């Protein structure tokens, strides 16, 4: 009698059970939540997930729903190639995201004694029949793709966002740009999987509930969609306090993601102000810190993984409490009537400021610091569509990043923002500081050499 053949990888009965029930599993599971949980559990790497999402041109002949179904199927089939423990890890992942029917379906192929002798904390909380579960919205449904943290809650493992956020088409490059910049040179931007890292922090809530940044969730979605199209690895966070923010900043910039990346972008969206000439940043617990402390983190000694790499820091919040009302264009002709804005035609807006009550600036290389306004002035955010600056930046990037370098993108963004007005005629002007950013940065969306 021949001994049973030794199986390598996932047992055959498990592989066949997934394949046999593939359509049911797609129907019974949420793709975005399952994809994120598989990365967090270590079933798949971010690169593996991206490979399953790349349909090699098929989307041109498929509608959006069919594309998502195909990506869902490829995700599950990829798991069948992930070793002998992947099946039980998948069951655990399904329980963690409350897809209990799918978990029970996978469990049905085995005898009870073949299940792993452990159970996760999430499984203990949710291991009930589906009929007993109340269909409550997921955290993502209520607060968007950003991860918020309680006051003393640990940050946890660094996990890239892998959900899909819809948005306008981002035009794709037809080449890697740089040949026309022989004098200045260009930053290297050609990797498929290490093109860039985005750390996005969007603080919306504060101790005073009346100061909630209404509409700011639109900015998170716009930025995530844009940088997904640029092939960046994205870490989105929401309400964090000052201590959590700096721990997060250290954790991200010392990670292998940043070590291997070609470019780093940080966007911090919150309330800000200028106090005695120093620009301040506010966190969700009401604590305030000098903006310079955040910039200092990117010095060479503190951030060795980003030496000689382009660093883009975006601070789209108030830098004071003054309203920029501009000056009339008709100063040379006093008889020409001055235009007055009609209030009913303008959307409701909020400013991004802290209510009002130097040391030497360290040198930073290869760094662009981007602001939504000039020093001393407030910024504006539409309650329905998001902040003026972020929305215009995303729009200009989508239209021009395929053939335009970042500094020209910022100039075009500033021009577009400068054309907007509030009900009372207030405006704002974007600005940026070039700190040794001595080459051109092209994002080259959709084109890869590596």
From Swiss-Prot:
Zymogen activated by autocatalytic cleavage; association with the Dark apoptosome brings multiple molecules together to facilitate their dimerization and activation by autocatalytic cleavage. Residues 64-109 form the CARD domain. Induction: By ecdysone; exposure of salivary glands and midgut isolated from second instar larvae results in a massive increase in levels. GO terms for cellular component: apoptosome; cytoplasm; nucleus; plasma membrane. Changing residue 318 to G: Fails to induce apoptosis. GO terms for molecular function: CARD domain binding; cysteine-type endopeptidase activity; protein homodimerization activity. Pfam families: Peptidase_C14 (PF00656). Ubiquitously expressed in embryos during early stages of development. In late third instar larvae, dramatic up-regulation in salivary glands and midgut before histolysis of these tissues. Belongs to the peptidase C14A family. Involved in the activation cascade of caspases responsible for apoptosis execution. Effector of steroid-mediated apoptosis during insect metamorphosis. Overexpression promotes programmed cell death. Interaction with Diap1 is required to suppress Dronc-mediated cell death; via Diap1-mediated ubiquitination of Dronc. Rate-limiting caspase in rpr, grim and hid death pathway. Recruited to the Dark apoptosome, an adapter protein complex that mediates activation of the caspase cascade in programmed cell death initiated by the intrinsic apoptosis pathway. This is Caspase Dronc. It comes from Drosophila melanogaster. The gene is Dronc.
